[in-house]
Amino acid sequence: MKNFDNTYFQNYQFAINSLPSVSCIIDGKVMKPGEHFLVDAACPDVKGTFRLLPFSYTNAVDKELLFAKLKQGLLPNEALLMKNAEDNRQFRRFVDTLDSMGFKIPLIVKSVSKKLLWTTSQQLEKIPMLTFPDTIIKNTDEITVDIDSKFIPAYGCRNIIGYLPGKNKNTKGYVVFTAHYDHLGMLGNNAYFPGASDNASGTSMILSMANYYAKNKQDYPIVFILFSGEEVGLLGSKYFVEHPLFSLQKIKMLVNVDIMGSAEAGITVVNGEQFKSAFDQLVDINKREAYLPEIKIRGKAANSDHYFFSEAGVPSIFIYSNGGPGYYHDVWDKPNTLNFKNYDNVAKLLVQFIKELK
């Protein structure tokens, strides 16, 4: 494997909020972060025992009562228990509105019926916020929390890049395989988000492709890129597009893979509508070889590291597998939950796709 500019690494930095220590106690029971509750990724420090005041921000009457209470002022040991907070973006806008109005809120506790999904944040909010399933928090009157946050304005990260030279030195253009190797990390000292499906499985696929092409050289160079910063907002791939180690115009096709651990129901091709000939080629190969039960098409989406390449005019598709238990951005996304059904067949499909690439 060769490198560009005498290094396999591309270093850069971004801001990130971290939560090195979190604890929560309800009715004398220690709650497990990641399983029983989540701390908002942008949460500041908060410590104390709080009495929960229940409101529904989607109910007009409750909303009036809420604003009346906020105008009166919350005590330092009072927290808002917000029910029916299912739409995270809508609720965040609501909280931002409360903050912009100058209300002092010691703590917000969200109650949701759907599964807990964690994320990351590049900023530190003023109002601490926790999320619980309805089943845990609905009959709770009091909560004790101790959350320590650490905002890092310039966290060092790196992309990993290498390539295999082509057999024909006169052949112009690269084929590029990409995946992100980062995930969410830790929430406190004990809650680990493994990211087996998202995206250790995609990283594994890149290594599988590199192993194959190291033994089966092509006429043209093949580049392999593992991005960091995907979970923070596609930052690694954005940085690479803005600071490319080779001309992006030389890329014949970029294939980004994510969530490759369970393809019993086939795969989906994002940007398939934008690059229909590439999608049709994948479908034609699959009809001949019967690698997968189905290949679905999707349009443009800023949901993985292909995005900024395609925005820069690079022919780019993003492939993810369909099937498996569906663990995603949670503490249950572990290696033993992946069955790797059709994993080898996805690799064979990609090899044949590149072989027939025009």
Which residues fall in each region the model found?
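Noncatalytic luminal/extracellular "stalk/propeptide" segments of secretory-pathway proteins
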Residues: M1-A79
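Structural recognition of the beta-strand scaffold that forms the well-ordered cores
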Residues: Y8, E78-M82, I105-V109, I161, ...
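Solvent-exposed loop/turn segments at secondary-structure junctions
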Residues: Q13-I16, A85-N88, V112-K115, N168-K169, ...
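Soluble metallo-hydrolase cores and metallopeptidase-like ectodomains found primarily
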Residues: P33, P44-L52, Y57-E64, S111-P194, ...
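Second-shell loop/turn segments in exported
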Residues: V39-D40, L52-A60, L81-E86, R93, ...
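A conserved hydrophobic secondary-structure block that centers on an alpha-helix together
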Residues: A60-K104, I108-K114
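His/Asp/Glu-rich mid-to-C-terminal helical/loop segments that flank catalytic regions of hydrolases
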Residues: N211, G326-K358
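Metal-dependent peptidase/peptidase-like ectodomains
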Residues: Q218, F227-Y327
